[in-house]
Amino acid sequence: MFKKSRQEIKIKARRNLSEKINPKRKNYIVDTSAVINKFLKKLIKKGLRGKLIIPNAVMAELENLANKGREEGFTGLEEVTKLHKYKQIKLSFNGPRPSESQIKFAKSGEIDALIRDLATKTNSVLITADLVQAKSAQAYGLEVIFLKPKQKRKKRFFLWNR
């Protein structure tokens, strides 16, 4: 039952994508997963217009990942840097930076909660590639654009005994 429900959510999210990328809509807010998976450039090319808000919590998370030497952090920071060249959107950095305890408990959803709070305060559509974040935001009554990330195929190695 859960698996079917999950697939229905993904199909519905894709079907409604063109309705949610509305030129009349003013504010969009992104989470870390959308930045790392390089979805923003694609959305802008599909017609995303208006104000794109990048929470300071997302920037802090990307900086933290980059400082730890993780590729996702560097990828995310490069993507944000590239967004400055698009004239179709107005880029804005907003919201509180997370505290040490919020960073420590990021896996339990502390940073996601900061992003949802900012989306509520700015009346923004949340753009995410995290299914849990999307469902939580919908439960709070936020409008969400969920974009499924491509899964990397695992390389399989076979050893043959001769």
Predicted regions and their residues:
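Short glycine- and acidic-rich boundary segments immediately preceding or forming the N-terminal edge
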Residues: 1-16
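Compositionally biased, low-structure terminal segments
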Residues: 3, 75, 94, 158-159
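Active-site-proximal, substrate-binding regions of enzyme catalytic domains
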Residues: 15-127, 131-140, 145-146, 151
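Short, charged, intrinsically disordered terminal tails
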Residues: 152-162
